[in-house]
Structures are given as structure tokens and as C-alpha cells.
Amino acid sequence: MENSQLCKLFIGGLNVQTSESGLRGHFEAFGTLTDCVVVVNPQTKRSRCFGFVTYSNVEEADAAMAASPHAVDGNTVELKRAVSREDSARPGAHAKVKKLFVGGLKGDVAEGDLIEHFSQFGTVEKAEIIADKQSGKKRGFGFVYFQNHDAADKAAVVKFHPIQGHRVEVKKAVPKEDIYSGGGGGGSRSSRGGRGGRGRGGGRDQNGLSKGGGGGYNSYGGYGGGGGGGYNAYGGGGGGSSYGGSDYGNGFGGFGSYSQHQSSYGPMKSGGGGGGGGSSWGGRSNSGPYRGGYGGGGGYGGSSF
């Protein structure tokens, strides 16, 4: 399970006075840090009230997570797995959920296989593979429910997982209304660099998925959902081996090419979902190696810094 991204943690809600040495001093108690940074506004050089620490191995990062909540310089900070810049604009990338979508499941994959595989990231409460209500035919996708948010975050950091010899795609299961509202990470805007809104994922249970109705889980591609957008395995233009076949129409034509039918899941509206504009963290700066996932109207450190 060793993955360098799993060793990197995001720390939000820092005291504006917290320095990198102060941050390092606190988190070194849990292991060896290979990197530590407090993100600052490039113009004013003032802290944007969030930062990152990177441990030498996953076990040390896990120990820091397990010790939450953390208080640094008088502030109770929020600790979570850092999302890579590449992934930060994905719908729901910063959402706080316990439920993951798993796509690209072949017919020989059972729910027990999902539980066995994903248990390496934390306790799995259950797994389900979605089947057509009429025919009982598996539709090529399912969901995994974890006991806590960090386990889901860890599993989601690894975008593609090998299960039963097949590569499957994993994403956070974020309801469409939370993506549109920015509830997957959007907090209230703060211009003072303080806590602002913490963006707790829309304040609703993320585990209530509507599987029926007309349309697929269209944030997640042509996996279909009650009649629209069947899953076609990793082929271009609907090619490849199909789960759902012509009965479900629009095939999966590559990652990110998702059906646009009405459903309980939806495509990301510009500025929503916790990436870029509308994230929980930071101001408007897009400079430096930490731009992308934490810049733009967030709750930690507003645009005035």
C-alpha cells in the first residue's frame, strides 16, 4: 500500500503566527518529516493559515492522523490526507465522506473481494455492487462504505486499484447537490486569514445514494444508473467490453467522459467541489507548488493576504 501521496498531510486552520519550525516541532513527535511547509501569500508573505507535512512512511502519517485533534499554537487544526495538485480539481476531491465509488468492476468481482481489498486502508462496513433491477446483471460499478473518513481518503488517494487482476477506478461518492454547492470542501469566505467556514461536506449524510430513476451517476462516467450510460471498460468511444451494453446507451469513453443524464450525481459546476475556486482552504494565489486544490475563496486565509 506504500504510496508517497499517503505520507503527505494537509493541515488547515493554522494560527497566522505559526511558523514552519513550529509546525515541524509539533508533528515531528509522530515520525520523521521529509518536508514541512506553511503556505504563504507570495505578495504579502503572510501565512494563508494552512500547510503540509510529509512523513517518511505511511505508518508515521497514520500515527499523526490517529492522534487527532491537534492543537498548534493555540489553534485546533484540521488534519487530512493531502490531495495532489493533479487531482485537486476532480469533483468532490476534498469532500469529507466515508463512501467511495468503484468503477470498472468485471463480472467475476464479488462484494467480498471489495471488502478484502479495501480493508487494507481501514475498517470497511460494507460493499455493494450495483445490478440492474430487472435483469440482475451487474452494471460494472459499486460502492464501498468505510467506518471513518480517513480510511476513505487513503483509498481515494490511490486512483486505480488492482482487484481480481483487473484495474478499477476509485472516487469519492459525493452527491450532486453537494458538488454544485461546493459542499465537498467549500467553506465560507474569510478575508482575515482566520478559520472561516470549515466546509464539512454540505452537512448531510454522504451515504444516502439514490440508485433508481432516470440516469446514471454522471459524475463518475458512463457507468449508468437506472437506464442511462452503461459502463464500457476503458475503451475509447464506447468500445471495449461492455457491462450493460446497448441497454444502457452511452458508454464509458475514457476517464472524465461522463454521461450527462439527470441523476443523483452530477458533473462539477465551475468553482465547486472543493478544488480551485471555492475550496475550503486558502486565498486566490495560484502560484507555487501548492496551487490548485487550496486556492480561491476558501475558509483559511482569504484573498486579502
UniProtKB/Swiss-Prot annotation:
Question: Which PANTHER family does the entry mention?
Answer: HETEROGENEOUS NUCLEAR RIBONUCLEOPROTEIN A0,-LIKE, HOMOLOGOUS TO DROSOPHILA SQD (SQUID) PROTEIN
Origin organism is Homo sapiens
| Residues the record lists as Omega-N-methylarginine modifications | 139, 284, 291
- The gene that this protein is the product of is HNRNPA0
Asymmetric dimethylarginine-modified residues are where? 291
Question: N6-acetyllysine modification sites?
Answer: 133
Q: GO CC: one term?
A: nucleus
- GO molecular function, one example? mRNA binding
Dimethylated arginine: residues carrying this PTM: 291
Q: Which GO terms describe its biological process?
A: 3'-UTR-mediated mRNA stabilization; inflammatory response; mRNA processing; response to lipopolysaccharide
What protein does this entry describe?
Answer: Heterogeneous nuclear ribonucleoprotein A0
Share the record's PTM remark: Phosphorylated at Ser-84 by MAPKAPK2 in response to LPS treatment, promoting stabilization of GADD45A mRNA. Arg-291 is dimethylated, probably to asymmetric dimethylarginine.
Function, please? Answer: mRNA-binding component of ribonucleosomes. Specifically binds AU-rich element (ARE)-containing mRNAs. Involved in post-transcriptional regulation of cytokines mRNAs.
Residues covered by region (Disordered): 174-214, 262-305
- Comp. bias intervals (Gly residues): 181-200, 269-281, 290-305
SMART domains named among the record's database cross-references = RRM
- Residues covered by the RRM domain: 7-86, 98-175
Task: List residues, modification N-acetylmethionine.
Answer: 1
Sites where Phosphoserine occurs are at 68, 84, 188
Q: What keywords appear on the UniProt entry?
A: Acetylation, Isopeptide bond, Methylation, Nucleus, Phosphoprotein, Repeat, Ribonucleoprotein, RNA-binding, Ubl conjugation
Where is the Glycyl lysine isopeptide (Lys-Gly) (interchain with G-Cter in SUMO2) crosslink found in the sequence? 80, 96, 98-99, 106, 154, 159, 172, 176
Cell compartments where the protein resides: Nucleus
